Amino acid sequence: MKDWNECFACLNAGLPDDVRRLKEAGYYQLAIARVDALLAEDWAAAQNQPAGAAALPVNPTPQGPDALRAALTAEREILRRLPQVYTLSASQLLAQMQQLVRGFTAEEFAALDAAGAMDWRFVEGEKRYICHAADTLLATHADLAARQLDPPLPLPSWERYEAQHEQMVRTGSASAEITLQAGIGMSDEAFAAALAAARAQGRDAVHVRVWLPLPAACPAQSGIELLSFTEPPAFVAPEDAAQRTAYWEADLTENRRFGAVYRYRSTAHYADPLHTAPDPVQPAFDTEEQLPHLEFTPYLRALAAQLTAGLTDPVQKAKRIYDYVTLNVHYHFQPPYFVQENISDACARSRRGDCGVMAATFIVLCRIAGIPAQWQSGLVARPELAGCHDWAMFYIAPMGWMYADCSAGASMARAGNETMRLHYFGNLDTDRMVANRALCAPFDPPMCAFRADPCDNQVGEVEADGVGLYGEQVVTEQKILEHRYL
């Protein structure tokens, strides 16, 4: 069975001009219709050959170039999902902000809009803002956050990580033992719709496949224990899987969730790259392109050349790239990676992104500069909460693999904490759960339907009767049961 997620590697093939113009103008239904026509086209029947002429050689691309067909296939699903991401009219978003922020005015809204503070697209001729635009404004504008009518609980203080940094400098490492409960399943509404569709086809159950992230073996994680499952999984991927999961497959007549409880030890080992001499010869692994999001575009090549001009020390090159990302890229909630064609190139142009976008930008710039770099992701696992997070790794001999958490570094830059900004160049903290060590890696067993996130896997994936679910169709849980600093 074909893995449709592999089509994303061909996104840089681009779109035919008419489809591109329709997409940019937000006429998604017309664009989908045009894509369908292109995918159905018989090139052999349309080739340059007058009626009644002698037979020509067999057309070498009877259905068009494979790369273009793959790009069109991925873009069709992107076009279908985009209107579900950009849902708010200006009046709806203004009303949301006025309900959240004391004294928020239409003039403030217009000024923020003119400054590009809110992500938007045209959708079928109307300007529509991303569904979580209000959350982004509150997260990125301190003046608005200070005027919230119902402010959230304060975030945990960074002081614990300053103390952890001091411990790591003093003793070489810090550790925590973490027990976490995670789960995933269909929303009741999605299950009811799927069951109705199944019954209309003469079936009495929904065939469900589920992948739930699990902690993977890596230098930062040890003592991994899978304590319990809601029901025995059909398969548990090995600890060294690129994106490790537990996998279930079931025919459901009633909706239910799938979950696990696991425990592991997280250890943050201290590295001091700025005060260690690199070897004169460095390795070349993990320095290649990885499409679509780690593409060596002309713009990224030019940026990497500017950042590393005059430098020969790989540590200084990596540090210059880290400085660029953490000092210039503003944290900004993102549309799903599914609907983005190249997150790193877009970040370098817009200077905004979330943790994964910042990590990808660091990785691709390092690779262009000849510095091995990898993706790593999973969860933030603090005593108070668990949540999604991504970061990067880079390799410099003789030190080996080190970390770069650019979004944490950017937070420290905003707070004026240079000590901790530098900490996240080379180091992490203990409050992590690592499930993924590669971007856009397949599962074991593979998911062939379009994933909710073809790049990463932080909360899991669900497939119902061969269709990948996403957004409000899926319900997930990540809960800290026990957290002990050791």
Task: Walk through the language-model features, giving the residues of each.
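TPR-adjacent "capping" and linker segments in tetratricopeptide-repeat scaffold/adaptor proteins
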Residues: 2-14
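Hydrophobic/aromatic-rich core segments of domains that either
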Residues: 13, 17, 21-25, 357-447
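Acidic low-complexity segments
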Residues: 15-16, 23-30, 238-349
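Inward-facing hydrophobic residues that define packing positions of alpha-helical scaffold repeats
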Residues: 34-35
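Alpha-helical solenoid scaffolds that mediate protein-protein interactions
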Residues: 38-39, 45
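Intrinsically disordered, low-complexity N-terminal segments that are enriched in acidic
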Residues: 50-52, 63-270
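Active-site nucleophilic cysteine motif
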Residues: 314-321, 351-366
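Low-complexity, Gly/Ser/Thr/Pro-rich intrinsically disordered linker/tail segments
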Residues: 428-486
